[in-house]
Amino acid sequence: MLQQIRGPADLQHLSQAQLRELAQEIREFLVHKVAATGGHLGPNLGVVELTLALHRVFDSPHDPIIFDTGHQTYVHKMLTGRAQDFESLRKKGGLSGYPCRAESEHDWVESSHASAALSYADGLSKAFELSGLRNRHVVAVVGDGALTGGMCWEALNNIAASHRPVVIVVNDNGRSYAPTIGGVADHLAKLRLQPAYEQVLEKGRDVVRAVPLVGEVCYHFMHSVKAGIKDSLSPQLLFTDLGLKYVGPVDGHDERAVEVALRSARGFGGPVIVHVVTRKGMGYGPAEADVAEQMHSTVPIDPATGQATKLAGPGWTTTFADALIEYAGKRRDIVAITAAMPGPTGLTAFGQQFPDRLFDVGIAEQHAMTSAAGLAMGGMHPVVAIYSTFLNRAFDQIMMDVALHQLPVTMVLDRAGITGSDGPSHNGMWDLSMLGIIPGIRVAAPRDATRLREELGEALDVDDGPTALRFPKGDVGEDIPALERRDGMDVLAVPASGLNHDVLLIAVGALASMALAVAKRLHNQGIGVTVIDPRWVLPVADGIGDLAVAHKLVVTLEDNGVNGGVGSAVSAALRRAEIGVHCRDVGLPQQFFEHASRGELLADLRLTDQDVARRVTGWVAALGACVSEAEIKEHLD
């Protein structure tokens, strides 16, 4: 049946029995396809019926449907004519794992950073009103943690004050509300329905009513208090108190019930909340059995078991996690903060070992950073573990709440540099540029597992300002020993005997292995290369100037944007020191990159060791070294 769905219009004639059959087929399709490619399986299994209902009730793309945390759009893609492309999911030139405007007119925004959909919806509804397009609804689907982000509530505050037709679908899969709201409300609702509770309540009612004169009055008073407490904790009041109409809660796996609720909401003609309760991982045993994450995001798996088809080697994240636990075991002042991602950032084990020292603040990076500042003011040393790309959201807090106060907060930036298959929104290629302008911050980029452990320890010993460590996604690789330590920097290679000191190659973090491969190629051409790892890449160490004066050319190699990165900082530092050596930056161009593997992107950007060696050889030749173009090609090909 799925093969017959070319667009939302094909859903309109289906019966309820056919819709149930289609939902089952979609789930089987999801498991089969995502098992092969990897991707966000659990969230999409949970929104099958909801997405079917959305496309039956609303006229996409005339009525924009905006998915917050865009990883829950796989079913939306299937229903808008892209099911045949799922073999290429998250692969170069294939289907994006997030909404993509270039793929379909049904994808309005390329959303992947959480809590933004309501603001998009607010703006779109205003634009439609100003353009006289009053017959267009805007639908925003939030949930999967997005409502823990403050931006959602800022948008709700504005939407509620309007009369524009914005339909907000809250996908409540158990991860949408903060525990003090959703957890207590759900607990009371379950408790009230338990037979044992009802029996106790019945006996208590009889006892109280039996008291002479005041019994009946006391009973009604106690019943009113109980009802008031329950109502005050109800999710509905979160929204109705803002002036929003509310429909629900609705069983999100009953397509007909969801459809009825959405049609009712569409008829209001103003802002309305539709509260839909779903189960992440619905219909797939291994996902439902994964209590921690419901298989939120997976690598390629065996669909029969849910187990990974390839065992990963030791990873950067695991290395960090183990080291942090080791340091925290020796120091009670070390605490950790995560923005709703304890598993992906390696903090789950930390929380199990030190449950009172891990703080999951939800998708609230701004709050995470200023809360860390408060912890530091109180004598703690907080470690904020966060994806590099999400650090952008907390820039003002890092600058004004942490750095201005010279507070010892350590930021650990996972997924730095090119991450690949998650696409342009997840590459961590701006952190060095952003952090480089913050006064007093120190930034380390470990090249291997040993250096990660060492530099984390060094960061935790800093007590007069913020620090940051950055490392990429994936396996950590072999350790790279240093030949010597010089002025706090590691020298990894020196010119071979008989060669001049032609090039000083400064390697940033995990690109040290590439730098050594480049140096080997250049040595084979008679170009002498010194390779150093500064360890702490920002601010620029004074010792770099001392090394630079002994070379003809300084080249920086980094997986950050070349604008404002380490290369820019090194060039500026050498100019300030009036060191006249030539400088060149090798890094990422200032643009957004489509999804592909890390290796494919580096090859496309000419950031392989062969490409970099060819560029450096050309620069050396331009400075007067006797290397011909023919020799360059002969040795590099």
Swiss-Prot record:
One of its GO terms (molecular function) is magnesium ion binding. It catalyses: D-glyceraldehyde 3-phosphate + pyruvate + H(+) = 1-deoxy-D-xylulose 5-phosphate + CO2. One of its GO terms (cellular component) is cytosol. Pathway: Metabolic intermediate biosynthesis; 1-deoxy-D-xylulose 5-phosphate biosynthesis; 1-deoxy-D-xylulose 5-phosphate from D-glyceraldehyde 3-phosphate and pyruvate: step 1/1. Mg(2+) binds at residues 144, 173. Keywords: Isoprene biosynthesis, Magnesium, Metal-binding, Thiamine biosynthesis, Thiamine pyrophosphate, Transferase. Thiamine diphosphate binds at residues 71, 112-114, 145-146, 173, 284, 365. Binds 1 Mg(2+) ion per subunit. GO terms for biological process: 1-deoxy-D-xylulose 5-phosphate biosynthetic process; isopentenyl diphosphate biosynthetic process, methylerythritol 4-phosphate pathway; terpenoid biosynthetic process; thiamine biosynthetic process. Pfam families: DXP_synthase_N, Transket_pyr, Transketolase_C. Its cofactor is Mg(2+); thiamine diphosphate. Its EC number is 2.2.1.7. The keyword S-adenosyl-L-methionine does not apply. It is an enzyme of class 2 (transferase). PANTHER family: 1-D-DEOXYXYLULOSE 5-PHOSPHATE SYNTHASE-RELATED, 1-DEOXY-D-XYLULOSE-5-PHOSPHATE SYNTHASE, CHLOROPLASTIC. Belongs to the transketolase family. DXPS subfamily. Homodimer. NCBIfam families: dxs, PRK05444.2-2. Catalyzes the acyloin condensation reaction between C atoms 2 and 3 of pyruvate and glyceraldehyde 3-phosphate to yield 1-deoxy-D-xylulose-5-phosphate (DXP). This is 1-deoxy-D-xylulose-5-phosphate synthase. It comes from Mycobacterium ulcerans (strain Agy99). The lineage of its organism: Bacteria, Bacillati, Actinomycetota, Actinomycetes, Mycobacteriales.
